[in-house]
């Protein structure tokens, strides 16, 4: 349906052939959004495109005095890595559309794997677990020293990515990050950054800056969420 359409507008050259796409959409906690934002700030990513939809709330994120779309694609063409970054927590009705958009874009760009993550309730520890859509993707987890989970429930965009990718024969990896806090904590975000760097050689987070950055990014995401809710309440009264 047209009203569900999400589209990508590329504004700079993007080359991620045989590379990696990282999903930073917050659909189950915002730890992934904070980690990917920190990674973008550390690993020489540049803006590659914007992600937009008539279903997205009309909002601009002002950073360093300049307006920004709330959902964007950042790319490091040297590393062949693209990051879907978002300050929006998408409505559940858009999760399937967003996941399929990512998979279609992977096929169009001839990338090799999507890496996503979710936050699961549990004691915050150093180990992060993983699930995957194919045997090949599970092999990537094993090679990176990440324990593969045999039984789990994966909600949201990450869950749709796994199911759709299994049918299409596309490699998708979802990392399960444990946290015992309602909101993201520094340790969980740090653990995710470290694990992503194992799966995606060359990317990194500056852990010294991460604690300070994570609080700022979290506040920005929460503010965008609050402003979005206020807009929705006023629009649909």
Task: Give names to the regions the model predicted.
Residues 25-30, 90-92, 119-124, 181-183:
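Gly/Ser/Thr-rich loops at beta-strand to alpha-helix junctions
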Residues 183-237:
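A conserved C-terminal secondary-structure "cap"
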Residues 37-41, 99-102, 190-194:
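Short, solvent-exposed amphipathic alpha-helical segments in soluble enzyme
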Residues 103-114, 166-171, 199-203:
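Secondary-structure boundary elements
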Residues 2-87:
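N-terminal short beta-loop-beta anion/metal-coordinating cradle
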Residues 92-138:
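Internal, conserved structured core segments that host functional sites
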Residues 23-24, 84-85, 116-118, 176-178:
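Short beta-strand segments
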